[in-house]
Amino acid sequence: MFEKVVIANRGEIALRVARACRELGIKSVALYSTCDAESAVVKFADEAVHVGPNHPGKSYLHIPNVIGAALKTGADALHPGYGFLSEDPFFAEICANNGITFIGPKPEVMEKVGDKAIARDLMQKAGLPLLPGTVEPVGTADEALEIGASIGYPVIIKAVAGGGGRGMNVVRREEDMARLYQTTRATAQAVFKDSAVYIERYLDAPRHTEIQLVCDSHGNGVYFFERDCSVQRRHQKLIEEAPSIHLSDEQRRDIGERAVRGALSVGYTGAGTMEFLLDHDGNLSFMEMNARIQVEHPVSEMITSVDLIQEQIRVAAGEPLSVSQDDVKLRGHAMECRVNAEDPDRDFAPAAGKLDVYVPPGGPWTRVDSHCYPGWSIAPFYDSLIAKLIVWAPTRPEAIERMDRALSEFQISGRGVKTTIPFHRRVLADERFRSGDVSTDFVEHFLAGEAAKVA
């Protein structure tokens, strides 16, 4: 097992990793930018190192500073969290070259699954279902037109290196294909420094379903069931829950086993997520793989009672998984609301500031993952996440009621600070959400309905 882990991240995930390290008897090193000097993880970790000014490109994304901090403190491993450098194969390789174990997949594996066209090809060969489309980059506008005619409109053009909802365009008519093909390539080059794109059939209003898995270096892989992440706005998730109420036990087992086989077939090690689209006929189609822990991992932990961060650390240290597939049981229903410093009444505009009041909720089966405290200033340089509020209950209706109760207790205020709590409570009261009739267009229609009522 590792002796010391440097945490190349900030906010709630950095604190989450530091806590896992302490429970495993591992010393932790927090990295912090200038404005994060008083952050909760800096106070909690065994050591802390300043890595640069507030701009992430000069601190959390500045590889020489991050590696320098790891070497300076004698850390033998590095946990990247999510975001920042967590899916950068170049960074993972630099860690390895400096004798630091990157807690995640090997660089060459990360590169394979990070290229969405290559990942589609590999997962198709491993037996995962795919939407009709290409498994190789589309080289010309003429080729794009041929593909559109072959699979039928609408289609979606995606950057092979894309992520976070960027680098994609939906094409509904043949006459728009050439223009949107060139637009997507230009965006991909500007944002991801890679102009390659692929094309697949576009599903209107599918459900977003993802499988959580962990694989070790001994050929073992375990899936921790699925999450439904359909409540999202502009491809940014707002509410996640587990399990999906739209999968049968047979589907759940089948897609979980296929996801693990797919991951093992490419030599994957560590925690990862297979993302799928679920159509209204119950068909699942592989979309992409995320080679890291995800923001919403707590809901999977709540329904399985397995600490996924600790599993990540164990397998990176060369240990086998601490659980087998037979050990992992699905119990009850969990839900997570992302409490962000945003104003839902102003198109989710940033609403950061100093927290004068911060009182998280309590009660049975109620969990708050947060780095915030009274007096903490939410910096405008990073994401707007204040806290992840997670609840568990025996059934989904009970989980909804528990979440609403917990949200009603959550006290957050400060000059200029607004949160998404009122939005979440309105969603929880919506009959469509309560019935589970939710797809990726839910928030768009929900907000339009609210606007119509005001008008």
Predicted regions and their residues:
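ATP-binding N-terminal substructure of ATP-dependent carboxylate-amine bond-forming enzymes
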Residues: 1-125, 138-146
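N-terminal nucleotide-binding beta1-loop-alpha1 segment
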Residues: 159
